[in-house]
Every structure is written in structure tokens, then in C-alpha cells.
């Protein structure tokens, strides 16, 4: 399923002001943050996680961080909608890579009794948004969760998992901390995110400098996501795709907002600097190839939404192979008989 929504830059989506953390919230430093450079042996070391922490902290310390929250607010509200669709209560929930708390603010205490929010950026946790739900903020890495097995009824994550080096491990950790019959509801950027910016930078850099370097971080393909969830132990999987299109005055405004979101590139093989004339050429290419009728330029954010359950005996299961009492061939004969009777 694919949905497409068009947003305007800097227009508040939900009209909710950013306020100080609730008096019931507290911040703890957890042992879940690994030593620098530690990953599992199978992980590809694609992203500079320390740089990503600094980027997110810088964004959270800006005088008006809400100015750049529009995309994460929107996706956070969509995850909350999916939680409400499940129509059950969750006494204890966990938000992984919570940022400033973009999911919890859209949930209510009738649905979620208490929520733990984790992030690698301490300033994002310090400046988290207010919620009615009792909240505990914990500094922790997505790949190294400091919780015991079978702890949470619900785990959510919004626009964070695309920055982990070891996504299979992160999903296994989520499955590990869920209780049996617990559910994971998440969202991450997909492979077509910012394709307009990627193409414009590549064309301009090739023309001006005789080659190009990656300036947009790599993303997981949607056909890999279901496999990774299944391998992590989840069942009854749902994976669907949204596209959110945001219109900007120009390419430089888009890049400014990405920085304000804490979503700048942090891959190890990124190019440290682009020449000014290359950037100007990329902006011209972007406008020429993609501009809207009103002169603005679109930026596409592809969102992969995922839902997976941890196994429990009470869950519905497919029948064993060969247990059917009627074959598809017999059903086809029945259809022929009914068609003949109608004549």
C-alpha cells in the first residue's frame, strides 16, 4: 500500500507547541551505550554513530527546534494511529530512538500506562516534549538495549533505525525485550527518500568535478525489511510504504532543514566538502528537473511502516500443510456447477 501526502515547509502539522518536560519525567544514563566503535562482528560499519549523536544533540539545542519537527511529528502521529488500531492496552511501552518524544505526545495514558524513551543524544532527551504518560528517559543505543528479556508490551520506533549499523541486531534486541504477544510498531526512511536531491548532487558533481561521492546515506530496501523482521523472530508481519512530499523554496532550504532535524549524512565515506560552484549547479539542476508550478521544489521522504508480533500460544496460526479437507480443484468444480445452474 502506498500513500502520498504533500506538506509545506515550516507549516505546523498539528499545532502543538513544544513545552518543557513533564514533572513526572526523569532522565537516566543507562549502561546500554556501547564503547566507541563496538559493533557485532557481522555488522557493516557504514555510519559514524558518534557523529550522528553530535548531529542530533546540535539539533536539539537550537533555540527553536520545533521549527524542524514537522516531519518527525507527522510520522510519530502515524505510528500512534497504528497503535490505537490494535485496540488493546499496553501497561509498559518502549520508544527506541525517541528524539524529543515524537510518538509519546500522540499517545494517551488510557492506552499506554508507562513509557521508557531511549536515544543516543542526551540533549534530545533533556528537551523532550510533554506527555500525559508517565515517562522515563534513558540514554541508550538502539543496538544495545539495557533491558531484560520479556519486559515490554509494546515497542515503537520512528525514523531512527535507518541510522544503525547493525539493523538485524537492533531488530533482534527489540524482539528480545518484548513480552510474548507483544508488538513492535516502527517506521524508518526508505530507499527512495530524497531521490531528487541525490540525483541533482550526482549530476552537478559529475559535470563540475568529473565524478561523484555519496551525499545521501544508504537506506534499506523494502523487500529486505520483511525478511529481517522474520529472521529476528517476529511473526504476523505487516510492512507498508508511505510517501511524504515536502515543498521547499529551494535546495539550500531543504539542506538547512535536514541539518535542523539531525538528519545530515553521517556515513563514513561521505565527502567532507562540496565546492560552492558545484552546490550552485546542483540547486539549478534540482529546480530545472523537479520544480513545481509555484516555483518551489519537492523533496520526497519514503517511509517504511512495519508491525511485528512476538510469538504466543494464543495467537492464530496457519493450519499444517496437508490438513485441508477440500482441495482447490474441488472448489473450481463447485464454481462451474453454480455457473451452470444460473444459466
Curated annotation (Swiss-Prot):
Keywords: Membrane, Methyltransferase, Mitochondrion, Mitochondrion inner membrane, Oxidoreductase, Transferase, Transit peptide
Biological process according to GO: methylation; mitochondrial respiratory chain complex I assembly
GO molecular function, one term: monooxygenase activity
Pfam families referenced in this protein's UniProt entry, alphabetically: Methyltransf_11
Feature: transit peptide: 1-29
Cellular compartments annotated: Mitochondrion inner membrane
Main location: mitochondrion
Known EC number: 1.-.-.-, 2.1.1.-
The keyword Mitochondrion belongs to this UniProt entry's keyword annotation: yes
GO cellular component terms, semicolon-separated: matrix side of mitochondrial inner membrane; mitochondrion
CDD domains on file: AdoMet_MTases (cd02440)
Subunit structure: Interacts with NDUFAF8, leading to stabilize NDUFAF5. Interacts with NDUFS7. Interacts with PYURF (via TRM112 domain); the interaction is direct and stabilizes NDUFAF5 protein.
Family to which this protein belongs: Belongs to the methyltransferase superfamily.
Purpose of the protein: Arginine hydroxylase that mediates hydroxylation of 'Arg-122' of NDUFS7 and is involved in the assembly of mitochondrial NADH:ubiquinone oxidoreductase complex (complex I, MT-ND1) at early stages. May also have methyltransferase activity.
Designated name of the protein: Arginine-hydroxylase NDUFAF5, mitochondrial
Organism: Mus musculus (Mouse)
Lineage: Eukaryota, Metazoa, Chordata, Craniata, Vertebrata
Gene (UniProt): Ndufaf5
Amino acid at each position: 500500500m502506498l500513500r502520498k501526502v504533500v506538506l509545506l515547509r515550516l507549516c505546523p502539522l498539528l499545532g502543538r507547541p513544544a513545552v518543557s518536560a513533564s514533572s513526572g519525567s526523569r532522565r537516566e544514563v543507562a549502561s546500554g551505550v556501547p564503547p566507541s566503535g563496538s559493533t557485532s562482528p557481522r555488522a557493516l560499519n557504514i555510519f559514524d554513530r558518534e557523529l550522528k549523536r553530535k548531529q542530533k544533540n546540535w539539533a536539539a539545542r537550537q533555540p527553536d527546534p520545533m521549527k524542524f519537527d514537522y516531519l518527525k511529528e507527522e510520522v510519530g502521529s502515524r505510528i500512534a494511529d497504528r497503535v490505537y488500531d490494535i485496540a488493546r492496552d499496553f501497561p509498559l511501552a518502549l520508544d527506541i530512538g525517541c528524539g524529543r518524544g515524537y510518538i509519546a505526545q500522540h499517545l494517551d495514558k488510557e492506552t499506554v500506562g508507562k513509557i521508557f524513551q531511549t536515544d543516543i543524544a542526551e540533549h534530545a532527551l533533556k528537551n523532550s516534549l510533554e506527555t500525559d504518560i508517565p515517562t522515563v528517559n534513558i540514554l541508550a543505543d538502539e543496538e544495545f538495549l539495557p533491558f531484560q528479556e520479556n519486559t515490554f508490551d509494546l515497542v515503537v520506533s520512528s525514523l531512527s533505525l535507518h541510522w544503525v549499523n547493525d539493523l538485524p541486531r537492533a531488530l533482534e534486541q527489540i524482539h528480545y525485550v518484548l513480552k510474548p504477544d507483544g508488538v513492535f510498531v516502527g517506521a524508518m526512511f526508505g530507499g527512495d527518500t530524497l531521490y531528487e536531491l541525490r540525483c541533482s548532487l550526482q549530476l552537478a558533481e559529475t559535470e563540475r568535478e568529473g565524478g561523484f561521492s555519496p551525499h545521501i546515506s544508504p537506506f534499506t530496501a523494502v523487500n529486505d525489511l520483511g525478511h529481517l523482521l522474520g529472521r529476528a523472530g517476529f511473526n504476523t508481519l505487516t510492512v507498508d510504504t508511505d510517501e511524504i512530499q515536502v515543498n521547499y523554496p529551494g535546495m539550500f532550504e531543504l539542506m538547512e532543514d535536514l541539518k535542523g532535524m539531525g538528519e545530515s549524512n553521517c556515513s563514513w565515506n561521505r565527502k567532507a566538502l562540496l565546492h560552492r560552484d558545484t552546490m550552485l549547479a546542483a540547486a539549478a539542476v534540482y529546480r530545472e528537473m523537479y520544480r513545481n508550478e509555484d516555483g518551489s521544489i519537492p523533496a520526497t521522504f519514503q517511509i517504511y511502516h512495519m508491525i511485528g508480533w512476538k510469538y504466543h500460544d494464543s495467537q492464530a496460526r496457519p493450519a499444517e500443510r496437508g490438513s485441508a479437507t477440500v482441495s482447490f480443484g474441488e472448489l473450481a468444480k463447485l464454481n462451474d456447477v453454480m455457473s451452470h445452474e444460473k444459466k
